[in-house]
């Protein structure tokens, strides 16, 4: 009897696998959201979506039906969400904005079926597109919206039904003809009900982007290679800058070109010549009260496709490659990149960028080589070599920094355990010791319980000129020196929560979220212990109330000047703690907000802070955001200061192609008031015109500089 039962279970799984098929049908459709072509009636229907949020129990009340096929040129998808109302709600008509605040349909594709990286395609209920790349980062996955490709979509409101029709060119996807199985996930966001529903069942302790939980679809008759080989994007930009204090100005005219060549359907070559990044959105400013640098994300498109190959070579706080270092002090002359799969289980990444010589900066050549190999279902290894070399014309100067390393990733069959081991070594002129980096991390993830532990050691000479290792650089505010010092860090954390499926009020309660970090100096003496304790109550509408307690024990070795005055904090032992209380409102309303207050000690003094974030939507024409943070620090005889950080973002959507965004940022810590206003017109798919105005003032609202930039590009696909 047991044998019969086992055979039956295997048969059921076999039948399900056979049903998950993307059929090949040699026909085209008109993407209009109407589904009136006969081919749609011939295709199997994929439905039975599960709840994901605010509950992950059972099948969804409002179901979704998905059909899909390909014709060796396009992957066609139709989706119908059976809503309970004719109303719809979207927060934006701007491309590449999170769909978390809109009614939308999402498809995720893992074309290599390696659970490492994938594609993200989303359409909101008014037809606005969002695309991006999903990449694995340690124990989870993140989403980068800066990657773009040309694809077609149409959304249609048909009574209570929300209909989505999509056509994705296969030429835009990395795939291997010998790998006929794609990992595919669908999910639907209904902002009106504040719900998420998903095709392949995923519990909420895992991200809905998690590529380990995709449905495996068999792809019939994949094409041998991409039909299109080239994408060329020439552009022209002009930039006027006026320095008010010194009464100088400068006008630049910059032609540039980007191209992409599909070596194979899974391996791509990218090149950029004389790139201009004047259209890139400004960074969101922060108040930094720590002793170390802050990480900001990469936004430049050239560095983004297959970016997980290059940017995921280390761990948080120790990353040997941080692409934002490239071009930060001098302009990029050219860059080339070869990235993708050379076999179904082998990925490579080769990157080379040359910067120009400036008045105070020498020209540099940056190179990165990465090899990623899937050893088994559970293990993946990565080896890398990074090089920065000073150049003089076509010659190399003996001034370099090189970093080599190897990483080993592990994931268990039940997806509850993830492990990571890292080793790196830095090579520099006349530096031969204390130049290593080690790390060992493990994560455990269960629905009610999550935990992690890690230990890493960083030598003071683990120099990564194009990396991000802020903690080895210690600024001595008394002697105005930067001292390199290695360290060892041990970390652990645990989070326990309980879900209340039958409650009319509570969604879940995070009873305990505790993290501990201990830092040892090169002599194995403890110089910093940090404790983080948090609990939160989440209600059915996803609003939340929470508290956070931070407690730090610091053995300060060098002078620290957070007030930016003439009286830095002197070296010594300090214990300080803060308590923060906060409330986040439901985010599916036209008006939403977050508020918090914090009070406690700070080194030898006191700290009081508060913050507020307000968002108001004028659907679907505008989105207004306002945030304000204040930090009052009193260090007794050393002085006191108050830091203000205010941000306003106003977005106006004229239609799906034309929008106007304005940022106002006031940061007293940086003595800056900044205005950045950008008009963006997508006059042809992924061909843009930008008009950007920037204006900078000091704390006293005295103008320091201003500028205006115009950029026009055009995309050719051959």
Regions found by a protein language model. Name each.
Residues 166, 248, 258, 268, ...:
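Catalytic-domain carbohydrate-binding cleft regions of carbohydrate-active enzymes
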Residues 70-72, 100, 159, 375-377, ...:
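A generic beta-sheet turn/junction motif
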Residues 86-93, 130-133, 175-177, 280-283, ...:
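A short, polar/proline- and glycine-enriched secondary-structure boundary/capping micro-motif
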Residues 17-372, 381-383:
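Structural preference for beta-rich elements and adjacent junctions enriched in aromatics
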Residues 203-227, 356-414, 544-595, 609, ...:
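Outer-membrane beta-barrel transmembrane domain signature of Gram-negative proteins
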Residues 64-66, 103-105, 119, 149-153, ...:
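One face of beta-strands
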